[in-house]
């Protein structure tokens, strides 16, 4: 709300940005998903969406175990699939997002915007870009892991 005099700040703290992936998403009957499994910077909204993909993947496996009597080894597959993609994809993409948002150099920002315009102008590049940032590429990669 605009006002004539400045606001007084009662408290402030620096938010430390972390980039980590748990060593395992499974330890016996304990399973990790979302922020419990992987922490990344909040710029770009990737953490919550990636956590939803963890949940969908894990829920499908738990349903097969519960309803179909599938082996609990499926939970190790969950770990392999989602941890691998968190390391290969989520960490890389969130670090890239942070660098892009925090660019200080006008020339670097201009080059980045030019790159985005080139992506938009090329249908194949645009499709590849959207598959990556929408996490569809990551889901496909995870599903390919056996």
Regions inferred by a protein language model and the residue ranges of each:
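C-terminal helical "tail/cap" subdomain of flavin- and related membrane-associated enzymes
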Residues: 3, 23, 45, 61-146
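Short amphipathic alpha-helical face segments that pack within enzyme cores
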Residues: 53-60
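FAD/FMN-dependent oxidoreductases across multiple families
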Residues: 1-46
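Alpha-helical hinge/cap motifs
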Residues: 47-51
